[in-house]
């Protein structure tokens, strides 16, 4: 009897999918609506993880675009310093850049979590694949809930950048970034480029690091919103040198599953054939970008199987007030089922069912 119950539970678990909400409308108001779909329990101090952009950067999510979600959550924008040489590699330079890029306008609250490197805290990777520990800024302790706001785009080192990249490199302190880039071999940034890990180990290390942030915050108190607009092949850290987007704006995704939302972003780009699609996907493949998604699923922080649930946009097809790309107005089904490993999971379910019958 117990065996039968366990196998039935296995079958049911096999068919569980994460919900990913999708809208073609890209607007400040829609960001709030997408967050509401997640039914999060945002308690206490809410951190809104952003990318501050670089000098003269064009494509990062602008603070004015995020104003409504900032007001709705009564949150605080949070960022971390870079390890590579830039204005963001020092807290003083980073603060000036934040001001230049408009983040402090209207007395918006913004915190650099690793402002003081001596306050870094060590987080243990519970199911390590490449690294055993991650290091993040000590001010993470000041926040009870997190909304990860990601500009989904390419990345010249990780293949692409979305929720998992924000959770890993985005949250890591300078010490943590070094650990990720060297797959746990070093904590001193001077080794990061000279002794950088191979792509497979680097992308796996990002998944490990991402898991520490997911584990740090209680379930229901962390969610993810990704904006698929201005989809350059380079990260927002490229600043003014980022190549112009060659993929049309697609929309906004929201989920409580960082693996599912990144997988959905990649799937939408695959299905949205534009002149820049092949170049984007080739970069993801060449840099083993999807390995981060695969390893993150293996660790257990999310699933590549998801339901894509369409949230209707404005009837006139308005794509918002801070983006230049066009969005296709074709109607979608309310729920589309996608699966990164559906065949394997279906096989597992059938095997379990056969055992139950026999």
Predicted ranges, named:
Residues 309-317, 349-358:
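C-terminal helix/juxtamembrane-tail motif
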Residues 316-334:
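Ser/Thr/Gly/Pro-rich low-complexity, disordered linker/stalk segments of secreted
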Residues 1, 320, 327, 344-345:
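Intrinsic disorder/low-complexity segments
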Residues 329-347:
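C-terminal GPI-anchoring signal of eukaryotic secretory precursors
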Residues 8-16, 338-343:
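Proteolytic processing junctions in secreted/extracellular precursors
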Residues 3, 17, 314, 338, ...:
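Intrinsically disordered, low-complexity segments enriched in Ser/Pro/Gly/Ala and basic residues
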Residues 15-72, 76-320:
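Extended, low-polarity segments enriched in aliphatic/aromatic residues
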Residues 2-13, 347-357:
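Cleavable N-terminal signal peptides of Sec/SRP-targeted secreted and luminal proteins
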């Amino acid at each position: 009897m117990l065996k039968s119950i366990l196998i039935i539970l296995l079958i049911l678990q096999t068919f569980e999918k994460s919900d990913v909400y999708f809208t073609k409308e890209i607007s400040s108001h829609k960001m709030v609506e997408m967050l509401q779909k997640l039914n999060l329990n945002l308690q206490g101090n809410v951190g809104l993880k952003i990318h501050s952009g670089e000098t003269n950067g064009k494509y990062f999510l602008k603070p004015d675009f995020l104003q409504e979600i900032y007001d709705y959550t009564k949150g605080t924008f949070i960022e971390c310093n870079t390890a590579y040489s830039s204005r963001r590699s020092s807290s003083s330079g980073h603060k000036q850049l934040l001001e230049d890029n408009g983040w402090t306008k209207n007395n918006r609250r913004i915190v650099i979590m690793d402002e003081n490197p001596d306050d870094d805290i060590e987080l243990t990777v519970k199911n390590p694949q490449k690294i055993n520990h991650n290091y993040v800024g000590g001010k993470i302790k000041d926040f009870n809930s997190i909304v990860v706001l990601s500009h989904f785009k390419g990345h010249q080192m990780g293949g692409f950048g979305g929720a998992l990249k924000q959770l890993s490199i985005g949250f890591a302190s300078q010490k943590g970034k070094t650990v990720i880039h060297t797959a746990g071999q070093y904590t001193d940034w001077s080794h990061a480029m000279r002794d950088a890990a191979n792509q497979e180990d680097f992308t796996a290390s990002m998944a490990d690091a991402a898991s520490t942030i997911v584990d740090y915050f209680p379930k229901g108190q962390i969610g993810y919103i990704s904006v698929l607009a201005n989809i350059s092949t380079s990260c927002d850290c490229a600043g003014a040198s980022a190549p112009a987007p060659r993929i049309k704006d697609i929309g906004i995704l929201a989920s409580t599953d960082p693996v599912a939302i990144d997988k959905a972003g990649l799937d939408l780009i695959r299905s949205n054939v534009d002149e820049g699609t092949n170049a984007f996907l080739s970069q993801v493949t060449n840099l083993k970008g999807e390995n981060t998604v695969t390893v993150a699923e293996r660790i257990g922080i999310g699933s590549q199987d998801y339901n894509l649930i369409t949230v209707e946009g404005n009837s006139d097809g308005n794509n918002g007030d801070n983006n230049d790309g066009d969005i296709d107005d074709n109607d979608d089904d309310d729920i589309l089922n996608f699966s990164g490993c559906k065949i394997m999971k279906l096989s597992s379910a059938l095997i379990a069912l056969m055992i139950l019958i026999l």
